[in-house]
């Protein structure tokens, strides 16, 4: 991941996120990715864009590849970055690191820009595209 346009979110692992085997459940990883996704939207202005215009991202797909288990107690750090921008869709890659700075998982989201009033997809906003120039 290059250093351009990366956001970082640090979260504390909660004991309730553990599964029968004593490590963080896969569902919790997706919760972490959701938090990182929204944090990224806020940082690049997409959340504000939605609140002002009711135009915003809608999740089309999400994927996570697990590399190492996570354990309690501990913190995680999630680095998120724009992977691609097409006409109306875009992708974000998230890298989840454990307390030892080891890559625990990599997740990818594909989203579609959506007009929540007209209920149709729409082009990715040019002003935000310039901010994240990939």
Predicted regions and their residues:
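Hot-dog-fold acyl-thioester-processing enzymes
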Residues: 2-61, 115-134
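HotDog/MaoC-like acyl-thioester-processing domains
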Residues: 3-9, 70-72, 83-134
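Hydrophobic beta-strand-centered segment that forms part of the acyl-chain substrate-binding groove
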Residues: 40-90, 104, 112
């Amino acid at each position: 991941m290059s250093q351009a346009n990366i956001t970082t979110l640090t979260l504390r692992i909660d004991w309730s996120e553990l599964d029968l085997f004593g490590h963080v459940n896969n569902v919790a990883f997706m919760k972490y990715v959701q938090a990182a996704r929204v944090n990224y939207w806020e940082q690049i202005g997409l959340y504000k864009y939605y609140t002002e215009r009711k135009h915003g991202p809608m999740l089309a797909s999400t994927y996570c590849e697990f590399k190492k288990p996570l354990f309690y107690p501990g913190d995680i750090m999630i680095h998120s970055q724009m992977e691609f921008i097409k006409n109306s869709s875009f992708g974000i890659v998230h890298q989840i690191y454990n307390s030892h700075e080891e890559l625990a998982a990599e997740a990818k989201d594909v989203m579609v820009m959506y007009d929540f009033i007209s209920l149709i997809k729409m082009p990715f906003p040019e002003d935000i595209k310039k901010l994240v120039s990939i």
